[in-house]
Amino acid sequence: LIKAHSGEKAPLLPASAERPSWFNPLVDDLADRIQQRINQAAHVTPINLVALAILGTPKHAISRPDLLRFLELSQQLLRDLPYGPRVSMTEMAPAEMIDYALQMEWIQCKPHPLGDVLSAEGESGVLLSYFRNNISHLFAVAGWVACCFLNNRRLSVAGVVRMGQQLYPFLKSELFLPWDEEEFARRTEQVADWLVDREVLSKSSDGVFLSRPRE
């Protein structure tokens, strides 16, 4: 499954007219804009999503129900809160994605009395990192919100946003994200509300705090 997209054009004429002393900053800025446009024209394949899920687990292994749930949420997030109008995504259902990844031998299935375990071992795990990295920017905000609750059960919405804004310059430069700090803050709030709607997180009755479910 191969699909090519064309990104939005970045005009070169204004750049060529700049003073020579501005050349290096201009090239850096142009490179950032080109990379942002490449990111905004991403196509999400089944293997991208499977890699994102499995490589995010401690031992690169996940139960089939958990993987199905992750794939379903990931697809729905991209549909409900699109990264940009040029991003497209596989039409496969989550179960079809798993079957496809197994058929292509990107992952393995180990039978278990409590349910099948799907994993990526050896070279497959290394190669899958390429597919995960190609779509990391699409899930940067959701990943940040989720990260906040790895070691915290309850945080204020404002706290999640504030900490994210402090980290955002690094995320922006590493992943070539398109938003400014205020846009990132709004995006963070949107993603948090989306996770609440999907019962991944819960929000206090006054709307101030977010909580993850008790284990």
Language model regions located:
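Membrane-interfacial terminal anchoring regions of lipid-handling membrane enzymes
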Residues: 1-215
